[in-house]
Amino acid sequence: MEVLNIHERELDADPMRIGALIDSLASKEDGLWPKHVWPRMDFDRPLGVGAKGGHGPIRYFVQEYTPGKSIRFRFTGPKGFDGYHGYEIVSSPQQPVILRHTLKMSTYGSGILSWPLVYRPMHDALMEDSLATAQVSLGLHPTIQPWSQWVRILRWVISRGKGRPQTTPSNAFNSDDQKQRAG
């Protein structure tokens, strides 16, 4: 089955500040990944082409990386996923800046069922939380998409009843706040 899944937000912010969020992925200062409610994104080395890692059961490596602009991750797991996902900044003069996450893959074997039943709803919720985290990190009011009942059930089952509830990413990294506190 062919899959194309896109999540995006128009952000009223300088593209360089948005690009810094992409560059912060998997770092202590990560201002894009919703680590407050989802498994952290981790890699075997600093963010760069070839870095291997993932989040939870989703495994991948950095296939392409243009600092401040885009990053693409190539799936290595779970079995049944062949493709990539990544973030990019889409901007043009006189147009709003868009932060976009694209997942494009073919599913086969167990992925044909696991994608629509488990991974897609979880992915959709995670990506919406990621974009809300970006908004908070940029000092913008976040657009929160409430988790579906199915996502809440999946999180409860997967965490054996210990899953964290959805929260506003108020503790997301904000570089301007950090500079003000330091100065």
Which residue stretches match the model-derived regions?
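Hydrophobic ligand-binding cavity/cleft-lining segments
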Residues: 1-44, 156-183
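Short, surface-exposed coil-to-beta transition loops
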Residues: 4-6, 55-60, 81-86
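Hydrophobic pocket/interface hotspot
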Residues: 18-25, 62, 71-73, 99-101, ...
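Short, exposed beta-strand/loop patches in secreted or surface proteins that constitute
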Residues: 38-42, 60-65
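Short beta-strand segments that buttress and anchor functional surface loops
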Residues: 46-54, 72-78
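Low-complexity, charge- and small-residue-enriched intrinsically disordered regions
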Residues: 48-51, 55-57, 117-129, 159-176
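Short, conserved beta-turn/loop elements at beta-strand boundaries and strand-helix junctions
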Residues: 66-71, 94
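Beta-strand/loop substructures that line and gate deep hydrophobic ligand-binding cavities in soluble
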Residues: 77-149
